[in-house]
């Protein structure tokens, strides 16, 4: 009894142990494996557990980041179970992936998409091979909603194919880079891990908060620009997210050079083609319209970081004022304190002194306190503001008006944008001395010292350094800087310089009635409180003069000079041209009187009229929308058919880039999806004649024969008009007599005497080397394709050639072959008579053959052309018959075309349709470059750009 109980306990213990062990292998998160049957107490059930992982597969790429995978299988076993929780299924994934071979590929090699397209070069399509290449450039974001579709096109652009891209193909997934895995674009995080969603912040730090860098933006505008090269800005080493954009379309050309003056592109008065350049350790993308008729802007962008300083140059070709913006991001050194927001300006003498800090006229912190002279080190810009100290800036008074406005913002936030409608004003004014108002307040004595205005800046620049001349010229270059932390309103509206003469009365010629040190008004500001009034007194050797600087313009106490009566002023910006994504705001010059009243433009000098200023403006995010192609022709030429059109979800993803996206986006936006099919009704077909295709011409070369086709009525034969019955036969001419048989070399022998065969290929070719069907050559003279081989001497035996084609194209037929009695004599094949081989042993020369069932294509007559001039379309019905029944078994490879273009006489020239306008925001220039005018969407969105030249 005790022994039986002890044995039973051990049995239960082992069973429970097995169940517990089964539970412990159930791990993982998600599962794509089969589920188990439910377990019932005390019944047979299936236990599941994972097997071992297989070895990692070979990497899908040799470089550039491929994919490798490994699998495991869910194992199962039937066994007795007890009530309670058990191992009901294998949980977790049965396949996992990881990146491999992530090192960069050689820059001069083919891309992975190119390799995949080239692999189709050996494939035969419609009887011939093609040279394939990717349809879109590698750096072009795919317009398809399926980024892991491989789009290839032939070199001549006549054919296209689309197949799933191989695993490891790079793809774009929102703001993450991705890689194709099993036809789906999977993300790669900034940590380099597949399926990771870690992203870079604006400073290029993985999972950073954007606080470790400074964002620098600026505008470059220069009036009365001289011809040749000028420096736009200097970009220090370590910069990332670089963007230089010419905002105003002109003949100017952007160029890029290093600090030593070596040009990477567009240097030495030569224009390079827009493309990607490997510069300073990063890829610099340079783009511009190829001619003046193209839309788009010229720009330079680079992801960075750069490993050396770069100088951005502009080649001015017509002397007009350029308008260029630049921006980049710099990492902040760990020990650097964040710079206080400052406003300051530069002054440069007629001798073109360098921008090394000695020419600083002063700066005003946001809290109103006054500091001494500062160098550009406070900005963390590598001790330089706009260029290398050794470069000739050419910023003298003769250069006219120039503004370099720079926004520097730490923390990765967006800058408020360039000043709106204001800037440095340079005008010539002849007037009388200005006197101060009683409300002018004197400031601290340090404000009158070099701590705010240096002696060079005021005495030398304004008064001529020791001269008591009463005529002087003020024509300064102002560089306004604004940084993060600036108050929402302008800190220093304008500094106006007035002059009081204490040594008797006398008029002064003031060439430039005021100088704006800062005219920046922060965009979208709700408050515009000016900087508190300040003034200062300066004593110079030019006499006992008092110079007051204040922030409010003072009313003139005497008459206004004619030269100062009227001036040009930029209007306020017009509304943004785009309601979503990025648009353009424009400001235009208007003529105003000295008191600010707008007058007719004829009062101002037309030669000094400023050009309009165009700036980008950001709108809200564009909503997805449904786009439809045009309706197709009716599927039938008579009776009831269907019309179809393509319906896709599109969204403006970025300025100039309108792309198809997943339909889920439009559905989530609750946009009503347009219908894709509708019924179309044509006049009733009625009885009509239908014809099969013409038979093959059997005439020999130089001879004539007849080809035939079957004619049938779509209904009862009596109902079709016999007068319109198509002809059922016509004459044909055999091929030219230049066809000749061509043979290849003999292949190896397959065996010994009596069994050995050697084979060669026999072709029928034209005089220019094209291979044509054998029926076009004389079959009586066709060389043998099979010879006996083996020993040097071999007795006579039967040798059969290859079977000829079946004598019918469908159903039951007969095929033939040539059977010869041959021997080998001294290694040479010779033909012998049949009895020497034994007629009873002769292989058959004919055999029954079967082709596909006798389905046959029939077509109706062609319809009228859809147009009376130009290029139209004509159609016909195509049906498959087996006897009198319409079936689906016909060979699709030989199906007759049911739609054909009809090219008639040219249409009369018509004036351009002014209503045909390109959709705003669509990059039509890019659509033309990549041959997308034939695409249904771009033909509509870019209808003006895609018009034929004669229209």
Curated annotation (Swiss-Prot):
Per the UniProt entry, the glycosylated residues are: 87, 367, 428, 475, 511, 524, 533, 544, 731, 807
Pfam families assigned: ADAMTS_CR_3 (PF19236), ADAMTS_spacer1 (PF05986), PLAC (PF08686), TSP1_ADAMTS (PF19030), TSP_1 (PF00090)
One GO BP annotation is: extracellular matrix organization
Any one Gene Ontology cellular component term annotated for this protein: extracellular region
Which stretches does UniProt call biased (Polar residues)? 534-544
Protein keywords:
Disease variant, Disulfide bond, Dwarfism, Glycoprotein, Repeat, Secreted, Signal
Question: Where does this protein reside within or beyond the cell?
Answer: Secreted
The disulfide bridges present are 59-100, 63-105, 74-90
Signal sequence: where? 1-22
Supply one GO molecular-function term: microfibril binding
Please give the residue ranges the record annotates as the region Disordered. Answer: 414-440, 534-556
The disorder this protein is implicated in is: Geleophysic dysplasia 1: An autosomal recessive disorder characterized by severe short stature, short hands and feet, joint limitations, and skin thickening. Radiologic features include delayed bone age, cone-shaped epiphyses, shortened long tubular bones, and ovoid vertebral bodies. Affected individuals have characteristic facial features including a 'happy' face with full cheeks, shortened nose, hypertelorism, long and flat philtrum, and thin upper lip.
The miscellaneous annotation reads: There is a significant increase in total and active TGFB1 in the culture medium as well as nuclear localization of phosphorylated SMAD2 in fibroblasts from individuals with geleophysic dysplasia.
Question: Subunit info?
Answer: Interacts with LTBP1.
Query: Could you tell me what this protein is called?
Result: ADAMTS-like protein 2
